[in-house]
Amino acid sequence: MALNVVILAAGKGTRMRSDLPKVLHPIAHKSMVQHVIDTAHQLGSEAIQLVYGYGADKLQARLGEQALNWVLQAEQLGTGHAVAQANDNIGDDDTVLILYGDVPLIQVSTLEALLAARDANGLAILTVNLHDPTGYGRIVREAGKVVGIVEQKDANEEQLKINEINTGIMAAPGKQLKAWLGQLSSDNAQGEYYLTDIVAMAHSDGVSITTAQPESAIEVEGANNRVQLAQLERAYQARAAEKLMLEGANLRDPARIDVRGEVTVGMDVMIDVNVVFQGKVTIGNNVTIGAGAILIDCEIGDNAEIKPYSIIENAIVGEAASAGPFARLRPGAELKRDAHIGNFVEMKKAVLGEGSKAGHLAYIGDAQVGAGVNIGAGTITCNYDGANKHLTVIEDDVFVGSDTQLVAPVTIGKGATLGAGSTITRDVAADELVITRVKQRHLTGWTRPVKQKK
């Protein structure tokens, strides 16, 4: 049977007080609905039906290039009505898994357990036990077997005492699901077509109904307002921090890091507070990351150090290299083994060779820097002529004095020395000393200007 996933994402989310459709609000820098879509892909779904309504243009702008079947729910008439809009895309032999675009923390392992709990041609529903089930549909059982789900507003006094609640997530056989959806009625307190009513229909038809539960109730919580969104964010971050610690990272304070992507760490990694990881980040063994650092789509080699408040984006930091504090590696930058950039050094589309150093206040862009090079404070590779970018090549063992400008395209030969304050516009041969600074003048008898009285 093919796995066909239906994701309900048509709601406006009025309580968010936002023009953005609710499901596009982010958890860990990714929209809630994208989390759910990614989970569906990880399950091996053969098709994903996205039921949408409010904010269609914004949804399609964000998600439109993905392999989704877009299903319009023009009127929001309940969850049963929403799923029914996808009937034409559901095969009789499909296993249909129903998920929610505002429930982003559901785990693949939980859904695998739900699918495994389902009997052939049976219905499986995900439930959870809550100390306070107020507001949720209750699971009604007879002799231990599920016979139906009753919504809060339709429940009697005895049913309101039930702590096992419906999460809304279920797996059903395609043929029977379409038949049950066709029998739904809106004759209830809400005047809506409840998806939950199909459970009683399944029981009446003698269909096997099984249940599964998540490891944690937070997996099935949704976000209807920004307070709940923040709570889900914290839960996501706590889970991410726990994963990093289990992989071998020491977190100075697990409550004060932000993971916004896929992070892989080696052993004995030390991560200080308020560090942000975004995109795909790979960190080797014995790495130290200082407070306030931001790492985006980058690779950090063994024994490297990222000092406080440095930004590493689409860059590579090699083994035993270091950056910061207050350093910035922009896309295409690479520090080779044992290289170092210090405070207020920026690199872009440039390589700093093994053992080379730029200690402070420098810009290195569109450059190839060899091994054993020292770049003095205030050095700039002048890579842009107003129309095009040009390359600066600095070969091994070059000494660049402070406040030097290298006007690209230019090549500095091996072992050359550039005097402080020089502006280099032509290639420099190996082992040459080049000084271009203006001759110093001494003017005697000079008087400073005096401020005029107003």
From Swiss-Prot:
> What cellular component GO annotations does this protein have?
cytoplasm; membrane
Please name the Pfam families in this protein's record: Hexapep, NTP_transf_3
Any one GO BP annotation for this protein: regulation of cell shape
Task: Write down the required cofactor(s).
Answer: Mg(2+)
Q: Where in the cell is it found?
A: Cytoplasm
Q: What is its main location?
A: cytoplasm
Its Enzyme Commission number?
Answer: 2.7.7.23, 2.3.1.157
Q: What are the catalytic residues? A: H360 (proton acceptor)
Q: Which residues hold Mg(2+)?
A: D102, N224
Binding residue positions for acetyl-CoA:
A377, N383, Y384, S402, A420, R437
Q: Which domain of life is it from?
A: Bacteria
Region annotation N-acetyltransferase: residue ranges? 248-454
Positions of the region Linker? 227-247
GO MF, one annotated term: UDP-N-acetylglucosamine diphosphorylase activity
Keyword Repeat appears in the UniProt entry: yes
Q: Which reaction does it catalyse?
A: alpha-D-glucosamine 1-phosphate + acetyl-CoA = N-acetyl-alpha-D-glucosamine 1-phosphate + CoA + H(+); N-acetyl-alpha-D-glucosamine 1-phosphate + UTP + H(+) = UDP-N-acetyl-alpha-D-glucosamine + diphosphate
UniProt pathway annotation: Nucleotide-sugar biosynthesis; UDP-N-acetyl-alpha-D-glucosamine biosynthesis; N-acetyl-alpha-D-glucosamine 1-phosphate from alpha-D-glucosamine 6-phosphate (route II): step 2/2; Nucleotide-sugar biosynthesis; UDP-N-acetyl-alpha-D-glucosamine biosynthesis; UDP-N-acetyl-alpha-D-glucosamine from N-acetyl-alpha-D-glucosamine 1-phosphate: step 1/1; Bacterial outer membrane biogenesis; LPS lipid A biosynthesis
Q: Could you tell me the keywords of this UniProt record?
A: Acyltransferase, Cell shape, Cell wall biogenesis/degradation, Cytoplasm, Magnesium, Metal-binding, Multifunctional enzyme, Nucleotidyltransferase, Peptidoglycan synthesis, Repeat, Transferase
- Give yes or no: UniProt keyword Transferase: yes
* Record family assignment: In the N-terminal section; belongs to the N-acetylglucosamine-1-phosphate uridyltransferase family.
Q: Name the NCBIfam families for this protein.
A: glmU, PRK09451.1
Q: Which protein is depicted? A: Bifunctional protein GlmU
Q: Which gene name belongs to this protein?
A: glmU
